[in-house]
Amino acid sequence: MTTGPFVPHPTLDPKSLGKVGVILGGRSAEREISLLSGNGVLAALRSRGVDAHPFDPGTQPVAGLAAQGFHRVVISLHGRFGEDGTIQGLLEQFGIPYTGSGVLASALAMDKEATKRLWQTHSLPTPDFVMLHAGADWQAVADRLGLPLIVKPAREGSSIGLTKVTSVAELPAAYEKAARLDRDVMAEQFIDGDELTCAVIGEGEHATALPLIRIVAPQANYDYQHKYFTDDTRYECPAPIPAEAAARVQALVVQAYRSLGCRGWGRADIMLRKHDGAPFLLEMNTSPGMTGHSLVPMAARAVGISYEDFVLQLAATASLELRASHDWKPE
């Protein structure tokens, strides 16, 4: 495992990338953020001389991707139909190399229950959880997880549909709020402490963790609005924690990333428990935000990588996970 700084290829010729598509927008609840991310990526690629073009599957038939003549695409979609393996599967069918994780890793990481169960099998620390349903025994849920606790859709991002519940009486409404977005709803143990995030670049033994960022939100409320549209959230990069503790968290995040089979890039959210500093993995994002408020560009800047250079290198990592087998012949 490596945890040193990620260094872009110094001799990368932008023209060698060919015609690059930036897939943005889409049909998820995170469309607004995806448009911000994608337009930032598009501008960065063009500023480096790349022949880059937008493609929005929210307004164009997604099957039209095959006719665009893209040599590769940068996926700037967030949430469903973009971060869950669906667009990745389509691109595999079309034979168009793409950035980020493949079909299975994307699907696993998008599903919080699947992610947490897999991490548990690898003995990786993640908060306890219960899957909810309309007739749940709310008192039993609170007894198991304690209060406060978190209720959220199993397959949404950007804190959409999330509620911090402080009493049993609040659980039914929190469940209904999340259930309007997803049929699968999770109640998760609340970990009191510092919220961190850690970006990872690469694949397998070459996976590299970027510096940790500590997120300090007003009233510890790092919701959708505070993530993207306000300036009162404070980001500390590198996170002000001892170097040995930071290295342990980075190593844990790389383990979590590998366990899901992620490649290209990703970003994990972590809580550091207040009373003992123990880290807990919350989730893995396989198509992180690239807006002006986003955290991966911030971590990259901390090791001397500009937004434009990061995006250029990201585009260069586009690949296919599957190989065509139509030419296979038995030996």
From Swiss-Prot:
Binding residue positions for ATP: 142-197
GO biological process: cell wall organization; peptidoglycan biosynthetic process; regulation of cell shape
Residues where Mg(2+) 1 binds: 269, 283
One annotated Gene Ontology cellular component of this protein: cytosol
Pathway stated in the Swiss-Prot or TrEMBL entry: Cell wall biogenesis; peptidoglycan biosynthesis
InterPro entries: ATP-grasp, ATP_grasp_subdomain_1, D-Ala_lig_Van_CS, D_ala_D_ala, Dala_Dala_lig_C, Dala_Dala_lig_N, PreATP-grasp_dom_sf
Subcellular location(s) per record: Cytoplasm
Enzymatic reactions: 2 D-alanine + ATP = D-alanyl-D-alanine + ADP + phosphate + H(+)
Keyword Flavoprotein attached: no
Cofactor: Mg(2+); Mn(2+)
Domain of life: Bacteria
Main function: Cell wall formation.
Family classification: Belongs to the D-alanine--D-alanine ligase family.
Protein name per its UniProtKB record: D-alanine--D-alanine ligase
Originating species: Ralstonia nicotianae (strain ATCC BAA-1114 / GMI1000) (Ralstonia solanacearum)
Species lineage: Bacteria, Pseudomonadati, Pseudomonadota, Betaproteobacteria, Burkholderiales
